[in-house]
UniProtKB/Swiss-Prot annotation:
GO terms for molecular function: mRNA binding. Residues 1-20 are annotated as: Disordered. Induction: By cold stress, abscisic acid (ABA) and water stress. The keyword Nucleus does not apply. Keywords: Repeat, Stress response. Residues 1-10 have a biased composition (Polar residues). Interacts with DEK3. One of its GO terms (biological process) is response to water deprivation. Expressed at high levels in embryos and mature seeds. InterPro entries: LEA1/2/D7/KIN2. PANTHER family: LATE EMBRYOGENESIS ABUNDANT PROTEIN (LEA) FAMILY PROTEIN, STRESS-INDUCED PROTEIN KIN1-RELATED. This is Stress-induced protein KIN2. GO terms for cellular component: chloroplast; cytoplasm; cytosol; nucleus; plastid. The lineage of its organism: Eukaryota, Viridiplantae, Streptophyta, Embryophyta, Tracheophyta.
Length: 66
């Protein structure tokens, strides 16, 4: 194998490894974003449920929930 071919091969290997690392990092970022989105959605649901419960409590105590 000539020196030029060897250098081209090694450059290709390095590029392939860099691409694989970037794909792994992108997958991790996607997973983290999905987890954050799910967590935010759950927090929003909890807040909404608490607000509805508070409204119903006030309605019950004031006699408006008939």
């Amino acid at each position: 194998m000539s020196e030029t071919n060897k250098n081209a091969f090694q450059a290709g290997q390095a590029a392939g490894k860099a691409e694989e690392k970037s794909n792994v990092l992108l997958d991790k970022a996607k997973d983290a974003a999905a987890a954050a989105g799910a967590s935010a959605q759950q927090a929003g649901k909890s807040i909404s449920d608490a607000a509805v419960g508070g409204v119903n409590f006030v309605k019950d105590k004031t006699g408006l929930n008939k």
